[in-house]
A protein has these predicted regions:
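Extracellular/periplasmic head regions of type IV pilus-like filament subunits
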Residues: 63-98, 109-113
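Alpha-helical assembly-interface signal, strongest on the long, hydrophobic N-terminal helix that forms
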Residues: 2-69
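Low-complexity, S/T/G/P-rich flexible repeat/linker segments used as non-globular hinges
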Residues: 2, 101, 106-134
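Secondary-structure transition/hinge residues
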Residues: 56-59, 76-80, 134
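Short alpha-helical scaffold segments that flank and stabilize functional sites
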Residues: 51-54, 71, 79, 129
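A generic structural signal for short, solvent-exposed coil/turn residues
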Residues: 36, 80-83, 101, 116-118
Length: 134
């Protein structure tokens, strides 16, 4: 009977469950958070890149901002941003020359929004060069 009590077979499983599982929980939480942040940054980069492309392809500065805003909103909806996140989208256009669509000009779009789950501000920038023959 004493030999059966001293037998340690199966104790490694108990030690693993008691010690290792609680240590894995923070790792899983971190990886989930990291995946969420990475996904949000990918979405905002696409919005910035396509928004500035739409601006550069337009005929005037006014229509460029309108079309760019429409593109950004459409992409945000299609890539899964919530309506509260879409409402927090902020865009800032910087041009190296005025009007922005003049030849050899550079347009830089900085866009940001507030993630509804983490309440972090996610930001990205993209720039487009205007052809010298425009």
């Amino acid at each position: 009977m004493k030999n059966k009590l001293r037998d340690e077979s199966g104790s490694a499983i108990v030690e693993f469950v008691v010690l290792a599982i609680p240590l894995f929980i923070p790792v899983f939480i971190y990886l989930n958070s990291f995946a969420s942040v990475s996904g949000n940054e990918a979405v905002i980069r696409v919005m910035a890149r396509e928004g500035v492309r739409a601006y550069a392809a337009s005929d005037s500065d006014y229509s460029g901002r309108v079309v760019s805003g429409q593109v950004i909103e459409l992409i945000a909806q299609n890539l899964g941003l919530s309506s509260s996140e879409i409402e927090t989208i902020d865009t800032n256009y910087q041009c190296s020359r005025l009007p922005c669509l003049s030849a050899n000009s550079r347009i830089r779009l900085t866009i940001s929004y507030i993630d509804s789950r983490s309440h972090r501000t996610i930001e990205a920038s993209a720039q487009e060069n205007i052809s010298p023959w425009k």
